[in-house]
Amino acid sequence: MRRYGEPPEKHRRYAFRAGVYAILPLNGSLLLTHQAEPTPEFQLPGGGIDPGEHPLTALHREVFEETGYRIAAPRRIGAFRRFTYMPEYDKWAEKICAIYVARPIRPHGPPREPGHTAIWTPADLAVDLLAETGSADLVARLLR
C-alpha cells in the first residue's frame, strides 16, 4: 500500500487508525469539507471507523456528520497509509485511508460536526485545495 507524507519515526509508537473518505462529484464540482480546527484545511469528507463498525456504515455516518449530505452508490477506488500526529486526539497514528467515490443525494441540514463546513468547489481546483497529499493524488487520478 502506498504511503504518503513522512516515513514513520523509529522511536515513536503509532496507534492504528482505519478511516474512510469520500470523493463526492456532482456537475463538475466536488463536495469537500473545510475543517476550522486545529488547523484550517480542506479535506475529503470522512473519518475514523469506530470499533465494530462496518466501513460503509462509517462512510455514510462521517459524510453526513461533516457535510449534512446523504450519499448513494459508494465504490472503493483505492487506499493509502500515512503516519501523522492527530492533534484533535493528541496522539500519533498510522492511518489507513480507504477512498470511495459516491453520489451525493441531497443535504439534510448543516454539518453536525463542530467546526466543519461543506464546500462545493470546481473539481479541477479540489486537487490544489486538499491538504492531504494522498487524497489529492486519488482525486487527481479520478479526474484524468
Region spans (language model):
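Local beta-strand/beta-hairpin segments that build beta-sheet-rich folds
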Residues: M1, I77-G78
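Acidic, metal-coordinating catalytic segment for phosphate/diphosphate chemistry
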Residues: M1-Y21
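A residue-level structural signature of the nucleotidyltransferase/glycosyltransferase Rossmann-like core
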Residues: Y14-A15, A22, E41, A118-I119
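Residues embedded in well-ordered beta-strands
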Residues: Y21-I23, S29-L31, A98-V101
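Conserved Nudix-box catalytic region and its N-terminal flanking loop in Nudix hydrolases
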Residues: P25-E66
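Unchanged
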Residues: I49-A72, F80-G134
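A small-molecule sensor/coupling module
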Residues: L138-R144
